[in-house]
Amino acid sequence: MNFTEIAEKLKQNQVVAYPTEAVFGLGCNPLSESAVKKLLDLKQRPIDKGLILIAPDLLYLLPFIDTERLNSRQISRLTANYSHPVTWVVPVKFGTPKFLTGRFNSIAVRISDHPAVAELCSLTGFALTSTSANLSGLPPCKTAAEVRSQFGQFFPVLDYPVGHAEKPSEIRNLLTDQLIREG
């Protein structure tokens, strides 16, 4: 499918697969509880784990981040360009749905330089959820063909290549700088 078709599916609160820096991600409208529940069911992922939100710039992520708890240095780190993808665990804004944060009082966000992420966010007007596109026990998909192989021929997938990152994103806590997952 092309960008316009995938953006329409996202606006209709469907789950889609799209390329990120290293692998294909499963995404949906983060403010649609029904879409997030479909995503969690598809991944067989417990709701208490929370989800990563991804966007091309901070503006898409601001509705979810408690910026009052961040200083200018932390905001700079959050928005900096890195040689590899970095996901930051940040204070969550009051009112952010629990179906996004899980059992945490924080939320994981990543500013992505992948052109597909930028285009989809621009077409939909919202950030995307991001969890690796793979069924439980199988490796993450690196091509649209692999997504179709795991999720079925008619699953909505954006035909566009993944980026050049070798591994999934590093995950760090922005307040403590604790490394949660190596990238």
Curated annotation (Swiss-Prot):
Q: What's a Pfam family this protein contains?
A: Sua5_yciO_yrdC
Gene Ontology cellular-component annotations: cytoplasm
Q: In which domain of life is the source organism classified? A: Bacteria
**Which molecular function term from Gene Ontology is one that the record holds?**
double-stranded RNA binding
What compartments host this protein? Cytoplasm
Nucleotidyltransferase: present as a keyword of the record? yes
Q: Which reaction does it catalyse?
A: L-threonine + hydrogencarbonate + ATP = L-threonylcarbamoyladenylate + diphosphate + H2O
InterPro entries named in the record:
DHBP_synth_RibB-like_a/b_dom, Sua5-like_dom, TC-AMP_synthase, TC-AMP_synthase_SUA5
Alphabetically list the UniProt keywords.
Answer: ATP-binding, Cytoplasm, Nucleotide-binding, Nucleotidyltransferase, Transferase, tRNA processing
Entry annotated with the keyword Cell wall biogenesis/degradation = no
Q: Show where the YrdC-like domain sits.
A: 1-183
EC numbers on record: 2.7.7.87
Any single GO BP term = tRNA threonylcarbamoyladenosine modification
Q: What does this protein do?
A: Required for the formation of a threonylcarbamoyl group on adenosine at position 37 (t(6)A37) in tRNAs that read codons beginning with adenine. Catalyzes the conversion of L-threonine, HCO(3)(-)/CO(2) and ATP to give threonylcarbamoyl-AMP (TC-AMP) as the acyladenylate intermediate, with the release of diphosphate.
> Could you say which protein family the record assigns here?
Belongs to the SUA5 family. TsaC subfamily.
> What name is this protein filed under?
Threonylcarbamoyl-AMP synthase
